[in-house]
Structures are given as structure tokens and as C-alpha cells.
Regions:
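HIT superfamily nucleotide-processing domains
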Residues: 1-137
């Protein structure tokens, strides 16, 4: 089995599972940002979020939501950071959502890269129009 997350799902790769059901498997990240950093993966191999069938999105993200609540309740975290990469910066080509426990003054910035305003309102309007066109039925 080439996909390490498929191997975790299959039980052939060891992992500290925290959730395992018919939709998803959630397990501790081996290199966590903080203790309790969890990866949530769909049971079926899907490389990215856009590869997840629409009917599976809701059930999958209900599991992500449960894990986010668990890091707060079970670990006493003040909140969580929830994120997924699609292709760029995606270390394993199997959809995975990071749920990272957060606390005030934990040293992690909300975004890990510089943020910049649009140079002109017209630039923002053009980007918004391109996205609306891509979202049109």
C-alpha cells in the first residue's frame, strides 16, 4: 500500500487513533504543532477536498467538527485551528484535515504567512468576479 494514510485506515500502519468509524479515521499527527494535533482522513482514498464526493462532504466534516470539540473538551484547549491543503504544501496525497489545539499566547500565529491587502479596490473586484464566474452553475 503506497498511501500512508490508507495504511493507517487499513490498520497496517500504527497510529494513535482517536476516532474510527465508517466515514473517517482521526489520529494523532506524528509531528504535532502541539500535543493533541489530530489528522482527520476520509476512509476512502481521496487525494484532495475537491475529490471528495459532494454526498460525503457533510458526513466527513461532521467528524472534523467532533474532533475540534474533543480537543477543547478533552485537552482543555481554548479553541482550535482547522486547516487542509489541496495539492500545494500537501505532504500526503490523501485528503487530511489538521485539527490543532490552540490557547492564548501559544506562539502560533493565526496565519503562517504574510497577509497583504489588495493594492486597489478594482483588483479585489476582479478577483471576486473571477470566483463568482467559477462558482456559477
Amino acid at each position: 500500500m503506497e498511501c500512508v494514510f490508507c495504511a493507517v485506515v487499513a490498520g497496517t500502519e500504527p497510529a494513535h487513533r482517536v476516532l474510527d468509524d465508517e466515514v473517517a479515521v482521526a489520529f494523532l499527527d506524528r509531528r504535532p504543532l502541539f500535543p493533541g494535533h489530530v489528522l482527520v482522513v476520509p476512509r476512502d482514498h481521496r487525494p484532495t477536498l475537491t475529490d471528495l464526493p459532494p454526498a460525503d462532504v457533510g458526513p466527513f466534516f461532521l467528524r472534523v467538527r467532533r474532533v475540534a470539540a474533543a480537543v477543547e473538551l478533552g485537552l482543555g484547549a481554548a479553541g482550535s485551528f482547522v486547516a487542509a491543503n489541496n495539492r500545494v504544501s500537501q505532504s500526503v496525497p490523501h485528503l487530511h484535515v489538521h485539527v490543532v489545539p490552540r490557547n492564548p499566547k501559544d506562539g502560533l500565529r493565526g496565519f503562517f504567512w504574510p497577509r497583504r491587502a489588495y493594492s486597489a479596490e478594482a483588483d479585489a473586484a476582479l478577483v471576486a468576479e473571477r470566483l463568482r464566474a467559477a462558482l456559477a452553475p
